[in-house]
């Protein structure tokens, strides 16, 4: 009996039946309801609300919890300090200098205490280690003067104190190291090009429409500054959870979206707003996705724009994302570039605007089959003819051109118009 039940359980696992103990399923997989099918499992949405993987501002919604090996942050202390928020960075900056001043001030006071200088304050015949050092406060002030190299005034070290000379050398060297480390952290944090990404824009929506009789996923990018991004490049990834045929659940699986890295179109000359296009072909993850399936799928497209800041030469990165609800089928972007007298003008008021266009509702795979069979034109709605007097004038001009054409060209034109 035990062997039969074990065989039955193994058979259930092979055909994709849900295990009887839900606690053995990972937490990420329990958020979805598996549906048993023949040799595979499909994922149905659970009751858990949708969550963006990346905000429109570029911030990733990923929190690292239960980190056990926190000592790894100290192994790269410089990067840890640079990544801190400004209030914590300033707090560390102040505390490091204050602690070093207090530490060496205590040592100066300890030397004076051991030598007996504190018992001979005001004695003209006594030669102390540090003149006019009467207590811990004066030792602390002397430590600040030594480390910041602002110059000695009322308090000064004497040559009759070898231990003081050694301490002076040690504090001077360690003070230089602290200055280099802390000032370097502040300089790197100030010069970070994060704010440069604030002037790089992404359209609020992505669109899917026809380009050269092929379905394309498109979004628009722009740069508000007159100083350009050097060596700008764009890439995109599809974030979508999936389940393999063996039943393995892969949360937030990342798939590359080709935006021209095989042809060099991903290298941008970002002087004016550009429309980034992804051709939906056999290698695209949207190859079999129709308009109806777009409304049912759950995915997120993450776009990353990288380049060097022209003024500083530092690498800058801007990010954004598009949920499935932010992808508009059958839309195109409104043009923003106009030609003026002697220059081109960009109207950013219409940067995010789109308009509807004639686009088939079928997937790119079916569209390619129609094109091979010659049935594509009958599925594309023709644009409306102009009405009124303008339409009559156009028809009259067309008839006049038809009479002037040779017989062979006229027949070919009639055949093309009928198609």
Swiss-Prot record:
Q: Motif Selectivity filter: residue span?
A: 149-154
* Keyword Transport included in the entry's annotation: yes
> Does the entry feature the keyword Thylakoid, yes or no?
no
Residue numbers carrying Phosphoserine = 5
One GO MF term attached to the UniProt entry: G-protein activated inward rectifier potassium channel activity
GO cellular component terms given for this protein: inward rectifier potassium channel complex; plasma membrane
- The intramembrane regions are 136-147, 148-154
Provide Cytoplasmic-side residue ranges: 1-86, 186-419
> Transmembrane segments in this chain: where?
87-111, 164-185
Q: Where is this site: Role in the control of polyamine-mediated channel gating and in the blocking by intracellular magnesium?
A: 179
Per UniProt, activity regulation is: Heteromultimer composed of KCNJ3/GIRK1 and KCNJ5/GIRK4 is activated by phosphatidylinositol 4,5 biphosphate (PtdIns(4,5)P2).
> Residue ranges under compositional bias (Basic and acidic residues)?
407-419
Query: Where in the cell?
Result: Membrane
Q: A single GO BP annotation from the record?
A: potassium ion import across plasma membrane
- Taken from the record's topology, the Extracellular segments are 112-135, 155-163
Residues of the region (Disordered) are 1-22, 382-419
Q: What is its main location?
A: membrane
Taxonomically, which superkingdom?
Eukaryota
According to its UniProt record, which reaction does this protein catalyse?
K(+)(in) = K(+)(out)
Q: How does it sit in the membrane?
A: Multi-pass membrane protein
Q: Name one Pfam family in it.
A: IRK_C
The Swiss-Prot or TrEMBL record describes its family as follows: Belongs to the inward rectifier-type potassium channel (TC 1.A.2.1) family. KCNJ5 subfamily.
Q: What does this protein do?
A: Inward rectifier potassium channels are characterized by a greater tendency to allow potassium to flow into the cell rather than out of it. Their voltage dependence is regulated by the concentration of extracellular potassium; as external potassium is raised, the voltage range of the channel opening shifts to more positive voltages. The inward rectification is mainly due to the blockage of outward current by internal magnesium. Can be blocked by external barium. This potassium channel is controlled by G proteins.
Task: Enumerate the PANTHER family for this protein.
Answer: G PROTEIN-ACTIVATED INWARD RECTIFIER POTASSIUM CHANNEL 4, INWARD RECTIFIER POTASSIUM CHANNEL
Q: What is this protein called?
A: G protein-activated inward rectifier potassium channel 4
Print the organism lineage.
Answer: Eukaryota, Metazoa, Chordata, Craniata, Vertebrata
Gene name as annotated: KCNJ5
């Amino acid at each position: 009996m035990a062997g039969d039940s074990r065989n039955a359980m193994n058979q259930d696992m092979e055909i994709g039946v849900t295990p009887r103990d839900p606690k053995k399923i990972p937490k990420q997989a329990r958020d979805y309801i598996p549906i048993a099918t023949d040799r595979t499992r499909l994922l149905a949405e659970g009751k858990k609300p949708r969550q963006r993987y990346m905000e429109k501002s570029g911030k990733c919604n990923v929190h690292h919890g239960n980190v056990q090996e926190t000592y790894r942050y100290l192994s790269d202390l410089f990067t840890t300090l640079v990544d801190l928020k400004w209030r914590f960075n300033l707090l560390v900056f102040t505390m490091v200098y204050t602690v070093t001043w207090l530490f060496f001030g205590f040592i100066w006071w300890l030397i004076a205490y051991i030598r007996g200088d504190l018992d001979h304050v005001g004695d003209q015949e006594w030669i102390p280690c540090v003149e006019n050092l009467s207590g811990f406060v004066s030792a602390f002030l002397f430590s600040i003067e030594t480390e910041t190299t602002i110059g000695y005034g009322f308090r000064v070290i004497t040559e009759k104190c070898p231990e003081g000379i050694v301490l002076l050398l040690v504090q001077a060297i360690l003070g230089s190291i602290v200055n280099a480390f802390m000032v370097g952290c502040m300089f790197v944090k100030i010069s970070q090009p994060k704010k440069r990404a604030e002037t790089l824009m992404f359209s609020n929506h992505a669109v899917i429409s026809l380009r050269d009789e092929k379905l394309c996923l498109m979004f628009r990018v722009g740069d508000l500054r007159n100083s350009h991004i050097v060596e700008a490049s764009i890439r995109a990834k599809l974030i979508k959870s999936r389940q393999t045929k063996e039943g393995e659940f892969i949360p937030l699986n990342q798939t590359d979206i080709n935006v021209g890295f095989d042809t060099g179109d991903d290298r941008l000359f970002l002087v004016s707003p550009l429309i980034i296009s992804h051709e939906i072909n056999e290698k695209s993850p949207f190859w079999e996705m129709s308009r109806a399936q777009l409304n049912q799928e759950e995915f997120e497209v993450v776009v990353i724009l990288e380049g060097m800041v022209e003024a500083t030469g530092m690498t800058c990165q801007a990010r954004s994302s598009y949920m499935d609800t932010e992808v508009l089928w059958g839309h195109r972007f409104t043009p923003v570039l106009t030609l003026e007298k002697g220059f081109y003008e960009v109207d950013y008021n219409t940067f995010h605007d789109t308009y509807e266009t004639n686009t088939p509702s079928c997937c790119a795979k079916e569209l390619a089959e129609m094109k091979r069979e010659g049935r594509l034109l009958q599925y594309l709605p023709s644009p409306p003819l102009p009405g009124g007097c303008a339409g009559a004038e156009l028809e009259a001009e067309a008839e006049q051109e038809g009479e002037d054409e040779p017989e062979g060209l006229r027949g070919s034109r009639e055949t093309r118009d009928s198609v």
